[in-house]
């Protein structure tokens, strides 16, 4: 069974994690602390194929890593996890380079638009990983009839 590590405990990370468990993957969701309430609640709802840990533990665990963190924190989170943890792994980046510092609505982080992207910066930070940028404008809540 493939092991997936997810960085981020928000609605995007937990929704993707739940779907992957339904497809028979083992999933560890990572946050700053292993005792994060959101991640522990998610584990309780998803059974034995779900686990929670730190960013570092999720990066260690996963053969494939999903980055579901806020774009303004993504690079720092990869550093917290340990850059070498991503060597020879596929990193699926779903983050958006949004700045929430002035409240809602957020704005784009200027250095990651026009001539550069957050995914390119992640790839530079993780030269031994295969970074794939996708799903960043797909609503994770699904369609409603």
Model-derived regions: residue spans:
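Fold-independent oxyanion-binding glycine-rich loops
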Residues: 9, 31-32, 69, 94-95, ...
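Short, well-ordered alpha-helix to beta-strand connector turns
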Residues: 24, 61-63, 129
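A short helix-to-beta-strand connector/capping loop
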Residues: 45-51, 127-130
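Rossmann-like NAD(P)-binding element
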Residues: 47-92, 96-104
């Amino acid at each position: 069974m493939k092991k997936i590590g997810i960085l981020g405990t928000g609605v995007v990370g937990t929704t993707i994690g739940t779907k992957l468990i339904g497809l028979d993957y083992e999933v560890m969701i990572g946050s700053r602390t292993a005792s994060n309430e959101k991640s522990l609640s998610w584990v309780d709802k998803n059974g034995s194929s779900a686990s929670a840990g730190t960013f570092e533990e999720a990066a260690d665990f996963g053969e494939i890593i999903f980055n579901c963190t806020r774009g303004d924190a993504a690079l720092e989170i990869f550093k917290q996890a340990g850059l070498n943890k991503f060597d020879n792994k596929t990193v699926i980046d779903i983050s958006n380079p949004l700045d929430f510092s002035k409240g809602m609505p957020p704005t784009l982080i200027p250095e990651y638009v026009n001539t550069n992207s957050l995914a390119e910066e992640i790839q530079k930070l993780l030269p031994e990983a295969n970074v794939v940028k996708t799903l960043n404008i797909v609503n994770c809540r699904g369609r409603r009839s």
